[in-house]
Design a protein with these regions (language model features):
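Acidic, glycine-rich segments characteristic of secretory precursors and extracytoplasmic regions
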Residues: 1-7
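TPR/TPR-like (Sel1-like) alpha-helical repeat modules
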Residues: 178-185
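Short coil/turn linking the two alpha-helices of tandem helical-hairpin repeats
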Residues: 88-95, 145, 166-168
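Conserved, well-structured interaction surfaces
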Residues: 18-91, 121, 138-143
């Protein structure tokens, strides 16, 4: 629901009028009732928790190949970066480098602690963490993934290009886009 090219038929809308979807579509002030959860927020932080758990536990594992451990850690960082970018896009003001030091974004949770008291971080801190998570992890990932459940190197470059473009880092966006296109520059012919 982040775009403006959305249309709902009347019967669909009225069947969901009390749901968060119906409320968002009709621009209601409050999307959720007190007993409802924000599924988008909860699911994103659930994935972030899992990524944090992987990042804290994998370095202590003595068995296994170092290359595989590096790949698992890289996938966790990429996923965490993606979900923080997604959360920042949904719940924070549009990124402005001049006000990023004071604009509040989302809580920046980097440890797998379910009981931690969290506060909203400033946009500049969230953006810095997103970019840090995407930095230098591509080489730990395979050029082609073994399955659709694993992240290939091209996807990291593509995400880094998009994130840098979103935050106004145009040179880095171009550099990452060119790296991604080295793997596949063909358009899909529908």
């Amino acid at each position: 629901m982040c775009g403006d090219n959305i249309f709902m038929k009347e019967d669909y809308l009225t069947s969901y009028i009390l749901s968060d979807i119906g409320k968002a579509y009709t621009w209601q002030k409050e999307f959720y009732r007190a007993e409802e959860d924000d599924v988008t927020w909860n699911e994103a932080y659930s994935v972030i928790y899992t990524c944090n758990l992987v990042l804290s536990e994998v370095p202590g594992i003595n068995e296994g190949k170092d290359a595989y451990k590096a790949q698992v850690m890289a996938e966790a960082k990429v996923n965490r970066a993606f979900y923080y970018w997604f959360l920042h896009s949904c719940y924070a003001p549009a990124y402005d480098p001049e006000t990023a030091g004071t604009d509040l974004s989302v809580p920046l949770v980097l440890e797998p602690d379910l009981n931690a008291k969290v506060r909203r971080a400033t946009s500049d801190k969230v953006v810095a963490q997103i970019l840090e998570d995407l930095k230098d992890v591509a080489m730990d990932l395979p050029e082609k993934s073994a399955s659709e459940y694993h992240i290939p190197r091209m996807a990291v470059y593509g995400l880094a290009a998009r994130v840098n473009l979103f935050f106004g880092n145009y040179d880095a966006a171009l550099e990452n886009a060119e790296e991604a296109l080295k793997f596949n520059s063909e358009l899909v012919d529908y």
